[in-house]
Swiss-Prot record:
Keyword annotations: ATP-binding, Ligase, Nucleotide-binding, Protein biosynthesis
Known EC number: 6.3.5.-
Pfam families in the cross-refs: GatB_N, GatB_Yqey
Primary gene name: gatB
Family: Belongs to the GatB/GatE family. GatB subfamily.
Function: Allows the formation of correctly charged Asn-tRNA(Asn) or Gln-tRNA(Gln) through the transamidation of misacylated Asp-tRNA(Asn) or Glu-tRNA(Gln) in organisms which lack either or both of asparaginyl-tRNA or glutaminyl-tRNA synthetases. The reaction takes place in the presence of glutamine and ATP through an activated phospho-Asp-tRNA(Asn) or phospho-Glu-tRNA(Gln).
Gene Ontology MF term list: asparaginyl-tRNA synthase (glutamine-hydrolyzing) activity; ATP binding; glutaminyl-tRNA synthase (glutamine-hydrolyzing) activity
Protein name: Aspartyl/glutamyl-tRNA(Asn/Gln) amidotransferase subunit B
PROSITE patterns in the cross-refs: GATB (PS01234)
Species this chain originates from: Albidiferax ferrireducens (strain ATCC BAA-621 / DSM 15236 / T118)
Catalyzed reaction equations: L-glutamyl-tRNA(Gln) + L-glutamine + ATP + H2O = L-glutaminyl-tRNA(Gln) + L-glutamate + ADP + phosphate + H(+); L-aspartyl-tRNA(Asn) + L-glutamine + ATP + H2O = L-asparaginyl-tRNA(Asn) + L-glutamate + ADP + phosphate + 2 H(+)
Length: 476
């Protein structure tokens, strides 16, 4: 953009899918009445002590294994000191110097090209409560239900260079945490919160001053916010103004970012080890137990699809976007024995209909077995591709659950009578001598015109390949 390079890093808070909080037994369910899920520990009453939730630690280990990161054998909890009304203790329990997860990377595709973003760390911490402003005129309500909810904060290197790349990374990260079941990924409920650190610089120059963009509760808003912030920073620099480090909020209504506060550095939080919590020690046998219990990872499943089904890397990655898509593909491929065709139909015609209806594949009106039979009818010559799409339309609309019944009722069965087809071909050739002359003169489009006439004469039931073969046999 105007000779500037965009530099983006992400901090993502993934709410871990435990039933109780990270340091107490209080429930983590979303939507309860305010302050009904906050116990003495969450309220920071005198004499209470935090007790580590084993499930939160195991989910952090799962994440490390999923991204090829190192699990720290010994990590430390620290107090992050700041004052806010919805933080009863006056500090947040987090990790600073030694996090539970170190390194790793997230790989994804953008425009068919494989990309990767390196991770710095992922650390465990507790969430704060919520300040409620809308229902209180001139006052602020405090809801501590969320206080103490376990979070995994995932921090990247500043490896992304566009809003498109940033969104592709965020979608892949979202896929990973939901696939392995450590987070439900609900962005509207705040289970998956992304903050983008955005800066710009001239190519080859040192990193510019970053501004942290918050309130990115959808992938659409994420792209809009980053694009606006990049334009704003470039305009400021072009006008001779310096960029000041700050935290900004994205307003979806105006499509603009506005400053919330000056951005703090680590020193402002005065981190120090929490004396109430011992070091978190994770033995290798614990890591191996977690590994043994984990589901097949999406990248491993994608590699299997390439090896077993002969799919491309791109197709295999697309079909492992969720457990539901992968299961649907495998069931359809098994039903028809044609994995590549199943892949093409799912990524093409089925995906288009899902997008139009704004539903996911688990809600598809056409199940994998039906799609598999439909593909079988193409392979065995019963249906042409165009006729198969008409059958899919009928199945999707709920006209009948039976593939063969739809084919019969709509008269879509492909013409396999070679004698009848040859008569249609002869009739078309007799009626179109000009096209024959043009074809023999080297005009290949003339052959297409003849094919079209024959398909029309057969009411679309002729096999296009048979038609082409028969025409060439008669004309060449």
């Amino acid at each position: 953009m105007l000779g500037y390079e965009v530099v983006i890093g992400f901090e993502t808070h993934a709410q871990l899918s435990t039933q109780s909080k990270i340091f107490s037994r209080a429930a983590t369910a979303f939507g309860a009445e305010p302050n009904t899920q906050a116990c003495a520990v969450d309220l920071a009453l005198p004499g209470t002590l935090p007790v580590m939730n084993r499930g939160a630690v195991e989910r952090a280990i799962q994440f490390a294994l999923a991204i090829g990161a190192q699990v720290s054998p010994r990590s430390i909890f620290a107090r992050k000191n700041y004052f806010y009304p919805d933080l009863p203790k006056g500090y947040q329990i987090s990790q600073f110097e030694i996090p539970v997860v170190v390194g790793g990377e997230v790989e994804f595709y953008l425009d068919g090209e494989k990309r990767s973003v390196r991770l710095v760390r992922a650390h465990l911490e507790e969430d704060a409560g919520k300040s409620l402003h809308e229902d209180y005129v001139g006052q602020t309500g405090i809801d501590l239900n969320r206080a103490g909810t376990p979070l995994l904060e995932i921090v990247t290197e500043p490896d992304m260079r566009s809003s498109l790349e940033a969104v592709a990374y965020a979608k892949e990260l979202h896929k990973i945490v939901t696939w392995i079941g450590i987070c439900d990924g609900n962005m509207q409920e705040g289970s998956f919160r992304c903050d983008a650190n955005v800066s710009v610089r001239k190519p080859g120059a040192p990193l510019g001053t970053r501004r942290e963009v918050k309130n990115l509760n959808s992938f659409k808003f994420m792209q809009q916010a980053i694009d606006y912030e990049v334009r704003w920073q470039i305009e400021q620099l072009e006008d001779g103004h310096a960029i000041e480090q700050a935290t900004v909020l994205f307003d979806p209504d105006s499509g603009e970012t506005r400053s919330m506060r000056s951005k703090e550095d680590a020193a402002d939080y005065r981190y120090f080890p929490d004396p109430d919590l011992p070091p978190l020690v994770i033995a290798d046998d614990w890591v191996q137990r977690v590994r043994a219990e984990m589901t097949e990872l999406p990248r491993v499943m994608a590699q299997r699809f390439v090896a077993d089904y002969g799919l491309s890397d791109y197709d295999a990655t697309a079909l492992t976007q969720s457990h539901a898509i992968a299961a649907y593909f495998q069931a359809a491929a098994k039903a028809c024995g044609q994995a590549k065709l199943a892949s093409n139909w799912i990524m093409g015609d089925v995906a288009r209909r899902l997008n139009t209806d704004e539903i996911d594949i688990a809600q598809s009106p056409v199940n994998a077995a039906q799609l598999g039979l439909l593909i079988t009818r193409i392979v065995d010559g019963t249906l042409s591709n165009n006729a198969a799409k008409q059958v899919l339309d009928a199945l999707w609309a709920g006209e009948s659950p039976d593939v063969d019944a739809v084919i019969e009722s709509k008269g879509l069965k492909q013409m396999n009578d070679s004698g009848a087809l040859e008569k249609i071909v002869d009739d078309v050739l007799a009626a179109n001598p000009k096209n024959i002359e043009q074809y023999k003169a080297g005009n290949s489009k003339a052959l297409n015109a003849l094919v079209g006439q024959i398909m029309k004469g057969s009411q679309g039931k002729a096999n296009p390949q048979q038609v082409n073969d028969l025409l060439r046999k008669k004309l060449d």
